Design a protein with these regions (language model features):
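Cytochrome P450 C-terminal heme-thiolate binding region
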Residues: 38, 45-58, 84, 203-218, ...
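Active-site catalytic microenvironments for nucleophilic, acid-base chemistry
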Residues: 151-156, 215, 268-275
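Cytochrome P450 catalytic-core helices
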Residues: 145, 260-285
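Surface-exposed helix-capping loop/turn segments at secondary-structure junctions
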Residues: 128-135, 156-160, 214-224, 279-280, ...
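Cytochrome P450 catalytic-domain helical core, especially the substrate-recognition surface
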Residues: 6-34, 40, 45-48, 55-60, ...
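Short, hydrophobic/aliphatic alpha-helical segments
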Residues: 2-3, 237-254
Length: 358
């Protein structure tokens, strides 16, 4: 183990490299990987941080030594008002319990059953598109994924609420990166415009979720959606999820499920608009395999080029472009000593653009 600090950019006396990191996180991490190799060191204020830019090192953090690396508290404590203790934020035994409870809801057969819903809502979106029309496809993708997630998650058609929900999501999603990356953390109780927007967005989302939970408690029959599975799930002691636990999981799935998918689809549209030959080949495959009939889940194995297009878009523009983990105790990664309390960053954005792998 090399006891020295890995190479990295020099920083300011007090702030370290925080200004550059906060101003352009992807540009900064790309610079560190290019200039300093697979393991680089920088400081965020008084905290040590490391960028690991190799798939084997990511495997060390996320699998081999996963018990020594927790989800970054510095990040998650600023978003617990919205995510609570759902799968995205929880740790240890509680995370494992929640994961086991939720796992049956995500069985491939269960997910495949939602294919018809996805096609129906997509057709409804396309009915509103006109030839030659200019569209904000990101807004369209956010809307249709919100509708699909609402229907498949808790059998709710939110068309009447979608504009208000859209505003609530925008309030929350716009504020999350601001809360995480700003150098000076402002307490939630201070009524800044950002804090007020965030609280309004969280309150509106909670009102919707708790209203749905109350309706489902009053009529607990299985509706074939994910919420039915979550409500029916029992742990080894026979305990079900509480309303608060269900709320946390539903908000996590609602936010993460619709926003990340919408981002991936938006970048796919963007890339297709810049690569007409790829677009033409994709259209040909779709017409050859489907003609003009609606797609089904059974068609997916016969659409390899469509699969490749989406995966390439996600490679180039991964919705989860950086992950942070905190070391619980001193350890060794890639031959370098990582001290307890240090943060390690893994960036799919940077790794996916490394010519050694792609």
């Amino acid at each position: 183990v090399n006891p020295q600090i890995p190479p990295g950019p020099p920083g300011r006396f007090f702030l370290g490299n925080l200004p550059e990191f906060a101003r352009d996180i992807l540009g900064y991490l790309t610079f560190c990987a290019r200039e300093y190799g697979d393991v680089s060191h920088f400081r965020l204020g008084r905290y040590d941080a490391y960028l690991l830019n190799h798939p084997d090192l990511a495997d060390e953090v996320l699998r081999t030594q996963r018990e020594n690396f927790i989800k970054h508290r510095f990040f998650w404590r600023h978003v617990t008002a919205i995510f609570g203790t759902g799968l995205l934020t929880s740790e240890g035994d509680f995370w494992l319990r929640q994961r086991r409870l939720a796992a049956p809801a995500f069985h491939p057969d269960r997910i495949a059953a939602y294919g018809g819903t996805m096609v129906a809502y997509t057709d409804r979106l396309l009915d509103g598109w006109g030839d030659g029309e200019t569209r904000n496809v990101h807004e369209d993708m956010m809307r249709v994924t919100m509708e699909i997630v609402s229907k498949t998650l808790f059998d709710a058609d939110v068309e009447s609420d979608v504009e208000e929900l859209g505003r609530a999501f925008e309030m929350v999603l716009r504020e999350i990166p601001v809360r995480v990356h700003r150098p000076i953390k402002i307490p939630d109780w201070i009524p800044t415009p950002g804090n007020l927007r965030y609280r309004r967005g969280v309150r509106r989302l909670e009102e919707l979720v708790y209203r749905i939970l109350a309706e489902r408690r009053a009529d607990p029959r299985d509706r074939g959606d994910l919420l039915s599975m979550l409500m029916a799930a029992r742990d080894d002691d026979g305990n079900a999820m509480s309303d608060r636990q269900l709320r946390d999981e539903l908000v996590t799935l609602f936010l993460a499920g619709h926003e990340t998918t919408a981002i991936a689809l938006s970048w796919t549209w963007y890339l297709l608009s810049h690569h007409p030959l790829v677009k033409d080949r994709l259209v040909k495959e779709l017409f050859d395999q489907l003609g003009r009939r609606p797609a089904t889940v059974a068609d997916l194995p016969r659409l390899p080029f469509a699969d490749a297009v989406v995966k390439e878009a996600i490679r180039l523009y991964p919705p989860a472009y950086v992950l942070g983990r905190q070391a619980l105790s001193d350890c060794e990664i890639g031959g370098w000593a990582i001290p307890a309390g240090a943060t390690v960053y893994l960036s799919p954005w940077v790794m996916h653009r490394d010519s050694r792998w792609f």
